[in-house]
Amino acid sequence: MTNTTQKSCKRLFLHIGTHKTGSTALQTLLAKNDRLLVDNNILFPNSGRISTCSGHHNIAWELNGDPRFTKENGTISELCLELAASDCNLAIISSEDFEYLHQKPDQLYFLKTALENVGYEIDVIVFFRDQARYAYSLYQELVKHGLDRTFYSFSKEVFRTGAFVMNGNWRFCFSYEVIIQTFAKVFGSNHVHCEAYSNPIHIQFLLVCGLSEISLELSDNTSNKALPLEKIVALLRINEFTKGMSEQDASKVRNAIFSSQIPEHPNLSCTLNNPVFIILHYVRFRPTRTWIRTHYNTKITITIIKDITSSIKCSPIFLWKRRRRHIIDSLVYEAFDVLKNDVESQK
């Protein structure tokens, strides 16, 4: 009697963010537990990770034509070789920068084909948060990366186009159904898992993957935290001044602000909340939230009354009467002193 076994496809979860939904914390957790994951028949590949505890950003950058891509951090070909050589039946690839590929479906088809050719069936996991909170958090993050536009200018573009574009190919889509529809067309609607963001993200992520029974070793809080309002304003000034600088020098100046110590204001720790913007986001993107709820039974909520009440209490206009403006000035001067000292040391 001859026994015949049919080789089944392995499964791969492709986590695509989106940005500002706990992706950094999730990737750090998975990377630090990669040996434990292998022991449970799960691979979190090394290829494409730009550091020991990062996600697979280099793969997303390769597909998106991002100048940050370097072959030394692993290519799609090397990722596929690692996946093919693994005995694990399940793999996880994660980068919020895969989100950008909703505007490049050909690259998604290329990725899908490459992964299928080494024996994997792909499921896409994407997290969303309500657009008002997303806007506040994303704006602060982009200021860290050199954005010099006001929050009003940023929001105006979001309301007008449903997206915000920076550095040419960083496209942050607020009309979430556009992202979902592109990935669903490539990977199949039944293979796209759309989730509403809640913190901590790893519990929900493992549940979607069917891995809720796995107990990962939690590390220190590695989330990408928002900056105090003073630092955001200081960075806006810096970004305007450093437009003509090389990215390396501009980054040194920004990093000086990141590391600066400023007095704590525990009762005034707000971001850029404003009741008007919350209402505008609610109305502008209500069709998006309705579409997601209808097609994926996922509810992205925004608690209007609660958010507006807290926003009024800590709006920037209200805060400026209380905060000391010299904190911002000192941050700017300190940042430029770092660059000045660096230049003088190289003479």
Language model features with spans:
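Anion-recognition interface
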Residues: 2-347
